[in-house]
Structures are given as structure tokens and as C-alpha cells.
């Protein structure tokens, strides 16, 4: 087989949706063939009213006239849609690398003609995804780019970089309440544009995945919202450090003196620094959660015994970090499917290579790899990709850390691994 071919794993039945802000409209400016997947997805997800297309012709490419046509397309959307959008995302595909659209001039024209509306330009170029900022980082940043600085801070905390609700069984929310956080905000949970705008009033951003790091960095620079990086982890020591970092950030931000804080003189609304009683309650909740998860790890370890375990990058954002954690708990990790490797997993990747040299690493660019590895048929496969390729009977259905954080993530994973021992997944 050709060595330049890569695996493509079909995820039948799993809907593909794009994160967006409420009351927004996506306008794709590109040649017709560039948005076939986007338009098919819109039909499948019934989101046709939230997007439109401005197709470029050869004359547009030659003259640059499409820049003025964008404003006309916005005007048409405002007059024809049942609910006029509050914000527009202008998507420019990879052809813009050759056209060189004057983004600032385009935004100035749109904001001048349509005051009170939000506008952002999004560049979509998968061909250049390996250079500089990835498309995912840039798109995620644009989602928060319409937030405006506010003179007031409330007690809320934003979770950045997540695409799905963290489960109600997660200790994070009770711990936050103990620290005086009245609301945990997430972009996809915003009911309307005003709720989206309130994200700018939050006192702290907690970044749960690398894809949100660039957005949080820019929010810290533009809006003055400090951030704590706390990517989903399955290592108990790292989870403890993350909670200490979040608590420390909330305590530092909470230094209220006569209604103002030390950060750029912004006023706070009815919030005080966490008290010792609040710290004690948070510590109790965290100790309880940690004790529960240590019991869960012990039960799963006893149940699995020497059963081989395979970790997959479709299940978690940092597969080598998960492999390191599981190996540390005593599980028999035999392989890591790194079909979607990320740089933020590099340190753990090096650790696995040095400390657990027997672990096989499967990458998407090699068809021959799987055929020669002789991976065990009875392995517990954590993630769809490895389970699908191996037609594994024991399948742990986790997707990109969705719904998971802190000690709850480890506890739920242990429960799923135990359940997978009796699994009998049948593949087409």
C-alpha cells in the first residue's frame, strides 16, 4: 500500500456540529465546491437558517468585488430571516490566501453600515493547518472575539475549550459554590446573545482543552480576565494541582477593598474573597471526591487484572497522558492509537517512550502498522477508533473527554472500563 495514505474512521450515526454563539449567522464566502460538507451538515442538523453562502465567481476573484458583495449579503440576511441575527461570522476559505482580503477594511465597512451588530472573520484553511496556529485554535478564538470589555466583574467563572456539558456528577460545581462562584458559564450554554455578552463579566477563565488556550490568552489581554489552564486529566496528582491553581486564582482575584479590586480598578458586584470556612468546605468536598475515585481505581484494577488496555486519541485529547496515568495505576496498557496527536501531549509521549517501552504506538499515516502489531483481541479499547479498527468486543465509549473533568473523569472512566469487561460490541 502507498505509504502516504492515512486512515479515515467513519463515525456513523454521530452528528457533527459546530460550536457557535446564539443569534449568530455564518456567511461562507468561497467557490461553490468548497462548502459541500458544510451544506450537507446543515441539512442533516436542520441548521439551514443559521448559515448562508456567497459564492465567488472568476470575475470576483479577478476584481475583488466580492468584498462589497459581503455587505449586501448581510443586508439580505437581515431583511429575509424571520429572526434577524445579532452577529455575523464571515468565513473565508483557503482561496483567500491568494486573494488577500483586507480583513480590517471589510470589518470597518460592515460595522459602519450595520452598527450594533457583531462581526468576525474566520479563515478556514485545512491545507495550512500544520503551520502556525491551527484552524481550531483560530476559530475558537473568533467565537469570543465579539465580547467587549466591561467595567464590572461578577462572581461567575467561564469554562473555555469545551463542547459539551460537564456531567452533574462532577465535583467541580460544588467546589466552585464553596469558593463563592455563583455561576459557571459555558459558551454553548448561552441562551441568547445577551447571555453570550455576559461571558465578558466573569472573574476567571478555566481552560479545559488546548483548543481554548489561544482564545483565553486573548481574553486576558483584551478583557482582563485571568486564566487557569486545567486540561482534562486522569492523573490524581495533576487533578489536585489543577484545583489548587483554580482556588488560588479565585482567591487572588477576590481581594476586594472598598468595592474595587486591584486589577485595573474594575468594580466587583457583591463578591468577597473566599473565607476560611469556604476553603474548609472546598477541601472537604475535594478530599471526599479523591477518596471516592481512589476506591474506584482500586476496584477497576482488581477487576481488570492483567487484561490489556488500549488508549485512543478519539477518546481523550491527551492519549499519552491517559496512558501514563493508567500505567501508574498498574493497568496493562499495551498500545496507544495516536491518530490525532497534539503537541500538548508531547511531554507525556516522551515519558511513555522512556518508561513503558513495550507500549505500541499506532499512527494514522501507516497502514502496515496495525497488521504487524498483533494486538490482543481481548483488550479493553478506550475510544471508537481503536475499537473500530480492531473490531474489539470490549469497547469504552468516550469521545474527546466530553462531559468529563477532575476526579469525576477518572471515576467515570473506571466504571466504564469495568463494564467493558462484560461487553459484547458487534461491528459491521
Predicted regions and their residues:
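An N-terminal assembly and electron-transfer interface module characteristic of large anaerobic redox
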Residues: 1-428
Amino acid at each position: 500500500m502507498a505509504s502516504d495514505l492515512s486512515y479515515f474512521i467513519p463515525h456513523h450515526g454521530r452528528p457533527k456540529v459546530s460550536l457557535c454563539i446564539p443569534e449568530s449567522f455564518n456567511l461562507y464566502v468561497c467557490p461553490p465546491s468548497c462548502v459541500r460538507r458544510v451544506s450537507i451538515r446543515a441539512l442533516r442538523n436542520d441548521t439551514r437558517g443559521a448559515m448562508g453562502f456567497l459564492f465567488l465567481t472568476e470575475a470576483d476573484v479577478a476584481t475583488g468585488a466580492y468584498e462589497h458583495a459581503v455587505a449586501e449579503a448581510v443586508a439580505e440576511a437581515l431583511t429575509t430571516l424571520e429572526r434577524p441575527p445579532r452577529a455575523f461570522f464571515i468565513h473565508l476559505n483557503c482561496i483567500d490566501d491568494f486573494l488577500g482580503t483586507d480583513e480590517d477594511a471589510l470589518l470597518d465597512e460592515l460595522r459602519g453600515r450595520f452598527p450594533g451588530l457583531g462581526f468576525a472573520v474566520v479563515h478556514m484553511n485545512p491545507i495550512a493547518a500544520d503551520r502556525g496556529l491551527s484552524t481550531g485554535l483560530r476559530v475558537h478564538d473568533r467565537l469570543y472575539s465579539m465580547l467587549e470589555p466591561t467595567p464590572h466583574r461578577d462572581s461567575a467563572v467561564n469554562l473555555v475549550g469545551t463542547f459539551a456539558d460537564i456531567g452533574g456528577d462532577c465535583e467541580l460545581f460544588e467546589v466552585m459554590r464553596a469558593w463563592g462562584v455563583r455561576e459557571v458559564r459555558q459558551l454553548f450554554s448561552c441562551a441568547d446573545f445577551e447571555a453570550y455578552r455576559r461571558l465578558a463579566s466573569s472573574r476567571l477563565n478555566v481552560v479545559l482543552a488546548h483548543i481554548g488556550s489561544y482564545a483565553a490568552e486573548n481574553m486576558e489581554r483584551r478583557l482582563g480576565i485571568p486564566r487557569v489552564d486545567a486540561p482534562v486529566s486522569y492523573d490524581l496528582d495533576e487533578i489536585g494541582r489543577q484545583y489548587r491553581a483554580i482556588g488560588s486564582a479565585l482567591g487572588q482575584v477576590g481581594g476586594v477593598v472598598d468595592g474595587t479590586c486591584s486589577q485595573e480598578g474594575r468594580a466587583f458586584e457583591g463578591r468577597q474573597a473566599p473565607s476560611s470556612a469556604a476553603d474548609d468546605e472546598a477541601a472537604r468536598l475535594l478530599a471526599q471526591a479523591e477518596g471516592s475515585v481512589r476506591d474506584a481505581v482500586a476496584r477497576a484494577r482488581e477487576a481488570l487484572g492483567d487484561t490489556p488496555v488500549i488508549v485512543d486519541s478519539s477518546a481523550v485529547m491527551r492519549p499519552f497522558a491517559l496512558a501514563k496515568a493508567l500505567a501508574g495505576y498498574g493497568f496493562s496498557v499495551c498500545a496507544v492509537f495516536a491518530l490525532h496527536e497534539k503537541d500538548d501531549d508531547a511531554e507525556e509521549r516522551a515519558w511513555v517512550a522512556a518508561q513503558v517501552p513495550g507500549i505500541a504506538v499506532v499512527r494514522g499515516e501507516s497502514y502496515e502498522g496495525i497488521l504487524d502489531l498483533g494486538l490482543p483481541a481481548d483488550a479493553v479499547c478506550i475510544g471508537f477508533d481503536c475499537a473500530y479498527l480492531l473490531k474489539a468486543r470490549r469497547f469504552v465509549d468516550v469521545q474527546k473527554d466530553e462531559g468529563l473533568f477532575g476526579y469525576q473523569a477518572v471515576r467515570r472512566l473506571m466504571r466504564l472500563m469495568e463494564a467493558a469487561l462484560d461487553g459484547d460490541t458487534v461491528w459491521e
